[in-house]
Amino acid sequence: PLIPVAGKPIIGYILDQLVESGIEEFVFILGYLGEKIKEFLEDSYPKIKKQYVIQSEREGLGQAIYLCGEFIKDDSEVLIQLGDTILDIDIQVFMHSKYNTLAIRKVQDPREFGVVELDEQGIVRRLVEKPQIPVSNLAIVGLYLVKEWPKLIHCLETNIKTGRKTKG
């Protein structure tokens, strides 16, 4: 997130886009370099409402999202964006989807990404994490709109309690 692009950290571009889209509340998941990220956010974005969650053990994206549960109301729609990718997307259009939504992009070598397999209507049939034999070339790019937050938290809690993981 702190890697500079044209003199500005990646997370700065991401936050500028989200703030311009009208998002007012943020929960940041901190792990490696967490204090430096927090310092950057406090110095560069003092006016946004923010909470911090510490992910002390790197147990994956699902666990990181689960840790945010205490800060998010059950009736909330939640936009999740990973902090290491700048996207050229209209966040407002994305947020107005009536469905749970994730952003995807065609890539040359899908083995380096989580990918989606779509049905005939363009609905996600399944997600496959870094497949050796790709089911598609549609990579998940780290932007998710969750319309049913309580269901997601319940599923993540079940996965964590049963030790279900995609890798490791």
Segments and roles (model prediction):
Residues Q81-D84, R105, V146:
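Active-site flanking residues adjacent to catalytic metal/cofactor-binding acidic residues
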Residues M95, I123-G168:
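Catalytic-core segments of class I nucleotidyltransferases/pyrophosphorylases
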Residues I89-E112:
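Conserved donor-nucleotide/metal-binding helix-loop-beta segment in metal-dependent transferases, i.e.
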Residues L61, R111-V115:
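Glycine-rich phosphate-binding loop of ATP-grasp-fold ATP-dependent ligases
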Residues I3-P4, K8-Q81, I86, I91-Q92:
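Conserved N-terminal catalytic core of the sugar/cofactor nucleotidyltransferase
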Residues E117-I123:
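Short acidic-glycine loop/turn motifs at beta-strand connectors
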Residues P4, E117, L145-K147:
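Short, well-ordered beta-strand micro-motif
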Residues L102, V115, L143-L145:
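Conserved hydrophobic/aromatic beta-strand scaffold that supports enzyme active sites
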